């Protein structure tokens, strides 16, 4: 296979709705722990999340909602991150992921993305005039050795 094996990791309600990452009305990390009937299942969700692949795909939009553009820089983790983003991450947000990731790959169609101002050895940018996840997945495997990828994107990809 010329692309990574992908696993979709998501929260979904019984009526089939995906987590509220597609809107700003609710935030999984801030609001779900306060909702009776939902908060009881969160420990299981986070426990399973820790067993996912060492490559994680998400979006800049979701990460902006989680506050990475302002959060203090984290310690390095064993996880490599792939983010799809055109205009949600700031230079601070990009640097946040460089500090956190073994390898950080940004997929963008924005020629002026703030990531182009960051000089970190583990930062790689896949520029695409028109987004093609198929081509991006192939490049992740061939250029960066990504064999397994967990996708968590708040229902927006």
Briefly describe each language-model feature range:
Residues 5-10, 111-157:
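A glycine-rich beta-strand to alpha-helix segment
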Residues 78, 103, 120-122:
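A generic structural signal for alpha->beta connector loops
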Residues 95-102, 106-108, 115-116:
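A mid-sequence interfacial segment
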Residues 1-100:
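N-terminal nucleotide/polyanion-binding subdomain common to many enzyme families
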Residues 81, 106, 124-125:
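Conserved beta-strand scaffold positions in the cores of enzyme catalytic domains, especially
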Residues 55-56, 104, 147:
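Conserved acidic residues
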Residues 83-85, 107-110:
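Short beta-strand/turn micro-motifs composed of small residues
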């Amino acid at each position: 296979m010329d692309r990574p094996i992908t696993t979709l990791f998501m929260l979904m309600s019984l009526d089939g709705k995906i987590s509220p990452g597609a809107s700003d009305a609710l935030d999984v990390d801030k609001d779900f722990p306060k909702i009776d009937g939902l908060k009881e299942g969160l420990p299981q969700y986070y426990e399973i999340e820790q067993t996912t692949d060492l490559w994680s795909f998400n979006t800049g939009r979701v990460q902006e909602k989680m506050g990475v553009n302002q959060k203090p820089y984290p310690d390095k983790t064993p996880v490599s991150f792939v983010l799809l983003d055109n205009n949600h991450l700031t230079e601070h947000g990009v640097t946040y992921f460089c500090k956190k990731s073994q390898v950080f790959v940004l997929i963008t169609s924005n020629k002026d993305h703030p990531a182009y101002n960051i000089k970190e050895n583990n930062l790689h940018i896949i520029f695409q005039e028109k987004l093609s996840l198929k081509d991006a997945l192939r490049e992740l495997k061939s250029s960066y050795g990504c064999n397994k990828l967990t996708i968590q994107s708040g229902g927006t990809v």
